[in-house]
Curated annotation (Swiss-Prot):
Protein name in the entry: Putative F-box and FNIP repeat-containing protein L414
InterPro entries registered for this protein in UniProt: FNIP, STK_FNIP-Repeat
Annotated FNIP repeat ranges: 123-165, 166-208, 341-383, 385-428, 429-470
Domain F-box: 4-49
Domain of life: Viruses
Length: 516
């Protein structure tokens, strides 16, 4: 007489396809012979990731429910808050932040294996050599420390950040040569002479800094300017409005320059090596002052003088961000492909046909009908934009359409073209969407306030949908079978949403549900 153990493996696996996940597991746990198939079977019902994460065959589960915290624990290093020297740091911890009342550091308190370390702003103790292990690569020092001894920051540190309120004198040699990323906070205003090591590639000096960054000395009877900024620096962020700033101190190795300056800018001032330039000035910028190699320009000027934007911007610039500056529509040069600005109004042909990516940051006066060229494929109505959208406002070739957080206006039926595949409604949007979403949208995002019925509103081509915190509508017959991923931003109330009624309204095609 045959027993079940005599059945062919393919036959057993075929029989298991007719069972629910629970019955599959119960069946295979009846004997050791069947248990060997546990990693060969596919499981089709939704399971909480936290329950299956430790299983060797967890990849066999086709449908998984994630919570943000679970996913972050899986993919990121957990930060351990160290409150006292007596705290037991869990094995495997790689990131530590000292707590508010942690104010005394002894040797060995921070163990080997820590990669990221942050001292809170209340820490007020002398930092000595050996306090920080040689495994730390990322170090953040806030407004603490009576003093930092030479050698107290180990040679393993590559990224060093001084917090927003840090304003202590740093001795020569304290910052090791291993540091390549160095950022000072907004109130730092101490001398940096011989402080910055020669291997730093990224350097940031912020608002309050008003110290010399160079000096003139005689070398062989010749007066020369000596820069405190190493020639190794390639990314220089200087946002201080220091009137004594001298462009001559900038090396030809700098490729990214972001600067706030209150003086005239002449041709030759900015190094020719710069390819990305952020510039804020309330003084005159002369034509040809921007080097030919610059392709990305953020140009927030308070004062244009006698020169137009076309005179200041050369043909090699493809990415142009005008920040809060309001510029006449006809001043945008040809050749710009990525444009961000704040026009007061738009007219036909005001934006050149070279623009493919357009971000508008403010509310425009009047109609924008046929004003945006068909070359635009990415359109972002950002910031305060809050105009009604009519047919003709959005060109037919736009593929990605984003409405900013302030947008909450009606959208005329057919106003969003069928070319759009990615559609994002902003935080405040809470209007009906029936006959609004075009048929080809694959990725759809609703903001925080959206809470309208979506039955018959979602097209059959949509794959991914994200809902905001306020959404509380029925999903029954509302999610098309094309959807494979759902995201719900319910925060702490997420756990109360998982029930039989809720899950029964989820299409079988959905394989991932994320609550966050």
């Amino acid at each position: 007489m045959l027993s079940i153990n005599d059945l062919n493996m393919d036959v057993i696996l075929h029989l298991l396809t007719f069972l629910t996940d629970k019955n599959k597991l119960n069946f295979m746990m009846t004997c050791t012979h069947l248990y060997q198939f546990i990693s060969c079977v596919k499981y089709n019902n939704f399971q909480l990731f936290d329950k299956i994460r430790g299983l060797s065959f967890r990849n066999n589960f086709k449908k998984i429910i994630y919570f943000k915290e679970i996913k972050e624990r899986e993919n990121k290093n957990t930060v351990f808050v160290l409150k006292s020297n007596r705290d037991k740091i869990p094995l495997g911890t790689t990131c530590i932040k000292t707590g508010r009342y942690f104010n005394f550091l002894e040797m060995g308190v921070i163990p080997e294996g820590i990669i990221s370390l942050e001292f809170c702003e209340y820490f007020n103790h002398t930092l000595k050599k050996g306090h920080i292990p040689e495994t730390v690569t990322h170090l953040t020092i806030n407004n603490g420390f009576r003093h930092m001894e030479k050698g107290s920051i180990p040679n393993s540190v590559t990224h060093l950040i001084f917090g927003e309120n840090f304003n202590k004198m740093i001795d020569v040699g304290v910052i090791p040569n291993s540091v390549v990323y160095l950022k000072f906070g907004r109130v730092f205003n101490q001398s940096i002479k011989n402080v910055i090591p020669h291997n730093v590639k990224y350097l940031s000096l912020m608002y309050s800094f008003n110290q010399p960054i160079s000096e003139e000395i005689y070398i062989d009877d010749t007066l020369k300017t000596i820069s405190y900024i190493p020639k190794s620096v390639k990314y220089f962020d200087y946002e201080t409005s220091n009137d004594e700033f001298d462009f001559k101190i900038l090396s030809e190795n700098i490729t990214y320059l972001n600067i706030i300056i209150n003086k005239h800018i002449y041709p030759g001032d900015i190094p020719s090596s710069v390819t990305r330039l952020g510039l804020l000035s309330n003084e005159d910028v002369r034509p040809e002052a921007i080097p030919d190699n610059v392709t990305h320009l953020s140009f927030d000027l308070y004062y244009f003088g006698n020169y137009s934007l076309n005179q200041l911007i050369h043909k090699n610039i493809t990415h142009l961000n005008l920040g809060d500056l309001s510029v006449s529509c006809d001043r945008i040069p040809n050749g710009v492909t990525h444009l961000t600005y704040n026009p007061k109004y738009l007219t036909k042909n005001s934006i050149p046909n070279s623009v493919t990516h357009l971000t508008i940051n403010n509310k425009i006066k009047g109609s924008i009908d046929r004003c945006i060229p068909n070359s635009v494929v990415y359109l972002n109505f950002n910031g305060t934009y809050d105009n009604i959208i009519y047919k003709g406002d959005i060109p037919d070739n736009v593929r990605c359409l984003i409405f900013g957080n302030n947008f909450d206006q009606y959208i005329e039926e057919g106003a969003i073209p069928n070319s759009v595949v990615c559609l994002n409604f902003g935080k405040l949007y809470n209007k009906p969407v029936n006959n609004v979403i075009p048929n080809n949208v694959k990725n759809l995002t609703f903001g925080y306030e959206f809470n309208k019925p979506i039955e018959n509103a979602i097209p059959n081509n949509t794959n991914h949908i994200e809902f905001g915190y306020m959404f509380n509508q029925s999903l029954k017959n509302s999610i098309p079978d094309s959807v494979t991923r759902l995201v719900f931003n319910y925060g702490l109330k997420s756990i109360y949403k998982i029930n039989k009624k809720f899950m029964n309204n989820i299409p079988k095609t959905v394989s991932v549900i994320l609550f966050r």
